[in-house]
Amino acid sequence: MPKVFEGQLSAAGLRFAIVVSRFNSFITDRLLGGAMDALTRAGADPELIDIVKVPGSWEVPLVTGELARQHRYDALICLSAVIRGETPHFDYVAGEAAKGIAHVSSETGVPVAFGVLTTNTLEQAIDRAGAKGGNKGFDAAMTAIEMANLLRTLRQAT
């Protein structure tokens, strides 16, 4: 019978950092609220949660990398919102932010949850930040909790 590994959804005793962009703060503040709601519902101690605010999505990977290399956190949560405009700026920012965040996780071994909204319209962003489409900040925090526990289990099993 194969052995199955799966992360638990308890945040008790885990340390988190949330990197959140100030740009589009009317969206990112809602994402942050959703993430904090998920963490506290799952038993996280607010004293073990650090919130780091950066100017925009472009800066998220740099700060996330710095925090991951400190190895003080069980998981990191990245929150920002990139909304398509009339220029190609969206494509550069959204793509590079996603690549940078993925790189941090794979290079450091620290789970990094992706709560970066990339939407075509403001309405879509609002929907995904707590209106019709749930709250992607909440979802990202739950992913961070699960991955922190899964990696802890896998590292203890070897």
UniProtKB/Swiss-Prot annotation:
Listed NCBIfam families = lumazine-synth, PRK00061.1-4
Recorded E.C. number(s)?
Answer: 2.5.1.78
The answer to keyword Ribosomal protein applying to this record is no
Drop me one GO molecular function for this one.
6,7-dimethyl-8-ribityllumazine synthase activity
Gene name tied to this protein:
ribH
The answer on whether this UniProt entry bears the keyword Transferase reads yes
According to its UniProt entry, the function of this protein is described as: Catalyzes the formation of 6,7-dimethyl-8-ribityllumazine by condensation of 5-amino-6-(D-ribitylamino)uracil with 3,4-dihydroxy-2-butanone 4-phosphate. This is the penultimate step in the biosynthesis of riboflavin.
Name of protein: 6,7-dimethyl-8-ribityllumazine synthase
Top-rank lineage group of the source organism = Bacteria
Which pathway does the UniProt entry assign to this protein? Answer: Cofactor biosynthesis; riboflavin biosynthesis; riboflavin from 2-hydroxy-3-oxobutyl phosphate and 5-amino-6-(D-ribitylamino)uracil: step 1/2
Q: Which GO terms describe its cellular component?
A: cytosol; riboflavin synthase complex
Q: Which residues bind (2S)-2-hydroxy-3-oxobutyl phosphate?
A: 86-87, 128
Q: Which GO terms describe its biological process?
A: riboflavin biosynthetic process
* Species in which this protein is naturally found: Solibacter usitatus (strain Ellin6076)
Tell me where the signal peptide lies: none
As for family, the record states:
Belongs to the DMRL synthase family.
What residues does 5-amino-6-(D-ribitylamino)uracil bind to?
23, 57-59, 81-83, 114
Q: Which reaction does it catalyse?
A: (2S)-2-hydroxy-3-oxobutyl phosphate + 5-amino-6-(D-ribitylamino)uracil = 6,7-dimethyl-8-(1-D-ribityl)lumazine + phosphate + 2 H2O + H(+)
- Provide the active-site residues from the annotation: 89
Query: What UniProt keywords are attached to this protein's entry?
Result: Riboflavin biosynthesis, Transferase
Q: What class of enzyme is it?
A: transferase
